[in-house]
Amino acid sequence: DSRSLTCELGSGPVFVAMCGANHDSHAFVAQMYARGVRAFMVERPLEALPECGYVVVENAIAALQCLAAYHRAQFRGTVVGITGSNGKTVIKEWIAEELPAGMKCYRSPKSYNSQLGVPLSVLMLEGDEELAIFEAGISKPGEMERLERIIRPDVVVFTSIGDAHQENFLNLEQKCDEKMVLAHRAETIVYHSYYEPLGRMIASRFAGRKLCDAASCPEVPETLIGNEASRRNARIVEAFCAAMGYPAPSFTEAPEVAMRLEVKDGINDSVLINDAYNLDLNSLALALDYLHNVALSRRRTLVLSDIAQSGLTDDELYGRVAGMVARAGVDTLVGIGPKLKRYAALFGCDREFYASTDECIARIGRRAVAGRAVLLKGAREYRFEKLAHALARKSHTTVLEVDLDAMIHNLNYFRA
């Protein structure tokens, strides 16, 4: 994104200049060069720039997709593709939460499921993950074939089928056909036969594959998850875990996906960015990028928990975190957890540390919050939603009750 250049970018960023019906990103090449970018993928030759390299391609998005497909081909872990009309992100996050302890998993950030979002998310794979989960979304025929070549999923999870983007398809069967392209090479397919005609079409077309129908999984009690659609999603997650040989999900609660990069007014004239659902290096980089865009002239506070299951040594992990924090221009780091405190010397900004989220809520200073843009970025087990509630500006509802009978009585009294 040419508007921000704050996330961790490895040995050097590449700016991909794309042309669309109403935009031409080549207009930002000079700006990106001035900000230190020295590698470009463009659709037409550039004017000579010192110490600059560029590749000219016919179509930048298509070239990016080819690059992502090559990167995916080097990956040796298991790849999961999730598609459907609704519930892709919810099920992705839910699956990630229910994985066995210690498993290193990558999942695509936010809802990166488009022709551009999928290659970007695939290129974020570090390569040593055991499991990678990607969303694939389409809006018209022909799109899924390109996404399938990039993702090449070993396992495909189908969510619900509904009317989203139906205007571009002749009927629901054609839409199901298009979505099923994602399973072209998949060995395992998870679906819910409640959603027709998808269930019937999958059972017919992929009869020779390993099929896991969520309808055969035990019902999730309404006392645990009240919403019917969420209970169906839960059974899809249960079917996935069974297909993979993982322990059965706990289903203590449905994932609160709205907690991702949610902006709210905070106490003491602050702005809160709540990204308290999960934490890894990729999602931290994206969240810091978002903080840069939201903060504008405000000072920046990052409230961060310890990071688990990164696959890196603590020295390497927190060294990288410190570099990301410095490049993002964070003014104050509020660290929660013993490991961040142990590596306090790596951070050059103002900093304060707490052993737990509850201690942070009780003791965090006004100076770290007042008038600032505050990013809350925590692992699920740290329950940062409690911190978000404590730091959010409270609004109260006032109810005005009017007794019309009494008003008429009073009016008649004074008329008399």
What are these regions (language model features)?
Residues 256-259, 274-286:
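Glycine-rich phosphate/pyrophosphate-binding beta-alpha loops
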Residues 63-188, 197-205, 366-367, 385, ...:
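Phosphate-binding loop of NTP-binding sites
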Residues 11-17, 120-132, 154-156, 291-311, ...:
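Mobile, glycine- and charge-enriched loop segments
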Residues 42-51, 154-271, 297-298, 323-332, ...:
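Acidic, Mg2+-coordinating active-site environments of NTP-dependent enzymes
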Residues 13, 32, 67, 82, ...:
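Residue-level signal for inorganic ion chemistry
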Residues 1-66, 294-296, 310, 316, ...:
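N-terminal leader/targeting and accessory segments in enzymes
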Residues 288, 322, 404, 408-415:
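Generic structural signal for well-ordered alpha-helices
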Residues 20-22, 46, 138-141, 162-164, ...:
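Short glycine-rich anion-binding loops that position phosphate/pyrophosphate groups of nucleotides
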